[in-house]
Amino acid sequence: MPSPADLKNIGLKATVPRLKILEIFQTSEQRHLSAEDVYRILLNEHMDIGLATVYRVLTQFEQAGLLSRNNFESGKAIFELNEGKHHDHLVCLDCGRVEEFFDADIEQRQQSIARERGFALQEHALSLYGNCTKDDCPHRPRR
């Protein structure tokens, strides 16, 4: 996981907002966070860090390779720690919850399809969208 020293190594000062936002991504039970999610966590912890600062820090972390940005169907950017391991996403259309998964068969099939069509696959992103089917889903909005 990135540390304050890592911030300095990539040319970013280890400021309180940067350290706190980095800590949120390292310790949050939820791996996929929007700027608004981060801001809400900061407010709940009584941190005086504005939403504009959150956006700026998230962009800096993305540019530095600490975070990855995903733009799912909701249209808002969702960030996660860039730990270098490829994975795909399942996205709930009801609440926006994101789950990661890795499936070697899917990865192989994508490579095979690319080769069959004359492509050497360099990178890809797969996001599957659906509705949770669990009756007791804790993430489903109450109706």
From Swiss-Prot:
CDD domains with a match to the protein in the record: Fur_like
InterPro entries found in the cross-reference section: FUR, Fur_C, WH-like_DNA-bd_sf, WH_DNA-bd_sf
Region (Dimerization): 84-143
Region: DNA-binding, residue numbers: 1-83
Role played: Acts as a global negative controlling element, employing Fe(2+) as a cofactor to bind the operator of the repressed genes. Regulator for biosynthesis of the siderophore alcaligin E.
Binding site for Fe cation: 86, 88, 107, 124
TM annotation in the entry: none
Family: Belongs to the Fur family.
Residues the entry annotates as binding Zn(2+): 32, 80, 89, 92, 95, 100
Source organism per UniProt: Cupriavidus metallidurans (strain ATCC 43123 / DSM 2839 / NBRC 102507 / CH34) (Ralstonia metallidurans)
Keywords: Cytoplasm, DNA-binding, Iron, Metal-binding, Repressor, Transcription, Transcription regulation, Zinc
Gene Ontology MF annotations: DNA-binding transcription factor activity; transcription cis-regulatory region binding; zinc ion binding
GO-annotated biological processes: negative regulation of DNA-templated transcription; negative regulation of siderophore biosynthetic process
Compartments where located: Cytoplasm
Protein name listed in UniProt: Ferric uptake regulation protein
PANTHER family tied to this protein: FERRIC UPTAKE REGULATION PROTEIN, ZINC UPTAKE REGULATION PROTEIN
Subunit-level organization: Homodimer.
GO cellular component: cytosol
